[in-house]
Regions:
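Iron-sulfur cluster-binding electron-transfer modules in prokaryotic oxidoreductases
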Residues: 1-316
Length: 316
C-alpha cells in the first residue's frame, strides 16, 4: 500500500535518526512511502500560536500536494506535524474557514486524503500480531521499557481519533510483540516541557526529571517514544534533569522505530543509534544480562526437576 510521507523539518535535522529508522522499518514491513514533492514546513508550534489561518494554510499546502498522489493516506512520524495536519483538516470542515485557507494557496486543498501517524499505520494497518509472527524468537526479550507518548499524540481525541487519549497502548503492544516487557508507566501522556527547552530550561528539567525518575523507579532499562521533541528533552537534556533532581539519570531514550529496526536486525547505520546522547548500550547490556539470568534460572529449574525425578526413580 502506498502512503504519502511527510517527514517534517526535524526529520531533516535534529531527529534525522527518526526519519531514517522510520523509512527502514516501513521498507522492511512492506509499507511504501512516497515523499510529498516540494513539501514545506507545517508551521510547527510557532504558527498556530500566532495565527490559526496561517497555520492551517501551511499544513493544507502539503495536503493539497498529496491529493495528486495515488495514496491511502498522508502519514508522518512527528506528533507536532500530525497535530497541525489533522487540525487543518478539522478546521477546514467549516466552509468559510476553508475558503479563507484556499485563498492563500496556489492549489486548493479538498480534504480528500486522510492523515495518520506512522505509529497508527504500524498499529492498525500492520498490527502487533503480524509483527509478532515475523519475529517468533522475541528479539527484545529481557528489555524493560517505559513507553512515553507525550501530550499531543492522541489529543484532542475528537481530532486525532487514534488510541486512548488518557492511556494509549499502541506503542506498548508493538514493543510487547518484539518480546520487550512494558512497565506500567503512569506518566505516558504527561508533558515533558515541549518547546520550553529554549525559553525555560528549568521547567523542562523539572518535568523531564519527573518522567525519568518514575521510569527508573519502575525498573525500566529505557524510555521509548514517538516524538522528536520529547526524545530531545529526555535524552539530550538528561544531564540538566539530573542536575535539577540531584540524581544522575542514565536512561537511554529510543524512538520506537529504532527498536523495531533492532528487532528486525536492520543495518545499524539506518537506525541512527549512534546519535543518541545517552548510550543505548546501557539498555542493551541490561537486556542481555536479564536474558542470561532467565536462561540460568530455567536451566537450574530443569536440573532440579531432573534430580528430583532421578531421586524418585532410585527410591522406587
Amino acid at each position: 500500500m502506498n502512503y504519502a510521507y511527510y517527514p517534517g523539518c526535524s526529520g531533516q535535522g535534529t531527529s534525522v535518526e527518526y526519519d531514517t529508522s522510520t523509512r527502514a522499518v516501513c521498507r522492511a514491513l512492506g509499507i511504501n512511502l512516497l515523499d510529498i514533492p516540494d513539501w514545506s514546513c507545517c508551521g510547527s508550534t510557532p504558527a498556530h500560536t500566532v495565527d490559526h489561518l496561517l497555520s492551517s494554510a501551511l499544513a493544507a499546502r502539503n495536503l493539497a500536494l498529496a491529493e495528486d498522489m495515488d495514496v491511502a493516506a498522508v502519514i508522518t512520524p512527528c506528533p507536532s506535524c500530525l497535530t497541525n495536519l489533522k487540525m487543518a483538516v478539522h478546521r477546514m470542515s467549516d466552509r468559510e474557514f476553508r475558503v479563507q485557507v484556499n485563498e492563500l494557496l496556489d492549489k486548493p486543498a479538498q480534504r480528500t486524503v486522510p492523515v495518520k501517524s506512522v505509529l497508527q499505520v504500524l498499529a492498525e494497518d500492520i498490527g502487533p500480531e503480524a509483527v509478532a509472527e515475523m519475529l517468533p524468537d522475541k528479539p527484545l526479550a529481557g528489555l524493560k521499557l517505559a513507553p512515553y507518548y507525550g501530550c499531543i499524540m492522541n489529543r484532542p481525541p475528537e481530532v486525532m481519533q487514534f488510541d486512548d487519549h488518557e492511556n494509549p497502548t499502541a506503542m506498548d503492544k508493538l514493543m510487547q510483540a518484539l518480546g520487550a516487557e512494558v512497565v506500567p508507566f503512569p506518566l505516558k501522556v504527561e508533558c515533558c516541557g515541549a518547546s520550553y527547552g529554549i525559553a525555560r530550561k528549568d521547567i523542562v528539567a523539572r518535568l523531564s526529571g519527573k518522567l525519568l525518575e518514575t521510569a527508573e523507579g519502575l525498573g525500566a532499562h529505557a524510555v521509548v517514544t514517538a516524538c522528536p521533541l520529547c526524545q530531545m528533552n529526555l535524552d539530550m537534556r538528561q544531564g540538566q534533569a539530573s542536575a535539577a533532581a540531584g540524581h544522575k539519570f542514565q536512561l537511554p531514550v529510543f524512538y520506537y522505530t529504532q527498536l523495531i529496526g533492532l528487532a528486525l536486525r536492520l543495518p545499524q547505520d539506518e537506525l541512527g543509534l549512534s546519535k543518541l546522547c545517552v548510550s543505548p548500550r546501557l539498555a542493551l547490556d541490561a537486556m542481555h544480562k536479564a536474558r542470561d539470568e532467565e536462561q540460568e534460572k530455567a536451566a537450574a529449574k530443569a536440573q532440579a526437576q531432573a534430580a528430583k525425578q532421578t531421586s524418585k526413580a532410585k527410591a522406587a
